[in-house]
Amino acid sequence: MAAGWGPKLQGRLAEYAKMKDTVLLGSIQKHMMREADKPSDRRQDIIHPSEMAKTGWCPRGTYLRIKACREADNPYLKPKENIGVQLLNIFDEGHYIHDKWQRRLWAMGELWGRFICPACDTDHVNYVSPKFCDNCGLSWEHMVYKEIALRALDPYLIAGHADGGVPSKRALIEIKSVGAGTVRVSDPELYKKYSQGQMVDLPGLWKAIETPFPDHVNQGQLYLAICQLMGYDFDKIVFLYESKFNQGAKEFVVDYDPKHSAPLLDSAYAINRALQGLTDPPVCPHNGCTDCEGKDYGTTITEGVGSAGEASPSRATNTRPTRRLRSTGPTRKLGGVPAR
């Protein structure tokens, strides 16, 4: 039989075929795939800020996903994804980069958020860099940081997590690992300038990044808007970029602008109302895309409901008091006094 006869294996089938010739690597990669295939613990019945922030976000696709979750009575319902080992490695590397920057801020006494003790399961919420578990005394080096939960479920149905907060700077932090693929997706023109075919000028590409990418700014502004709704006193977000190819680091600071995220909040509000049957489902901004037509959510859409004409709350002025972050002794927590 001639070499190369038959269809070329692609995706996971190709990866499985390569694994047969390894001593250890193949077993590790199979383990990675099995772990990735386990049911996700990430809620799919809410709107994620990270999806809203993308330039090509399809509100209709988000609507369909949440509607399917409700019909199945399963908040974790998600179409099966065949993620390859290379992409799994990319995800893991991003997690490691997040962890090291968060732990540096923790060691400095600057990191605010939620901390878990794995020894006794004590939940430390709204703490600043605890040095030990309040319940069992476990040292902070063995505790786990669970970031900052951000919720705007009513009326926006939005829920997510910020990478951290630094009260002394009144700043949220967002940590981004940046590789050639990041730039290719986030700033195609910049990528094109420093690439030729498969060849990429990585040092030049990294040096040329002088502002945070638009999708990242969208995400950060959404986080800050939700902080205002929750009463958290953060007025800026600091982006920490780390280069995947040479571990270089950059910082970008973006001040809160309520006008920036208002259209996204309007879209989230419209999705929530459509899910309640109060208005029509959102239309696809791309006249059909993989998010709304390329995924089988197993749900149906009722059109022609019309709009109740109620304005989005994002157009109203937020009059809620803001809680300041202040010191309360050996372990600093979130204070309850209004700002200004």
Predicted regions: what is each one?
Residues 1-172, 179-199, 317-328, 334-337:
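Metal-dependent nuclease catalytic cores that hydrolyze phosphodiester bonds in DNA/RNA
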Residues 4, 10-17, 127, 185, ...:
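Metal-dependent nuclease catalytic regions and adjoining charged, substrate-binding loops involved
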Residues 107, 178, 229-233:
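Alpha-helix capping at helix-to-loop junctions
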Residues 158-162, 175, 216-222:
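Long, contiguous hydrophobic alpha-helical segments, chiefly transmembrane helices and signal peptides
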Residues 165, 171-175, 233-241:
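A structural signal for short, well-ordered beta-strand segments and their strand-loop junctions
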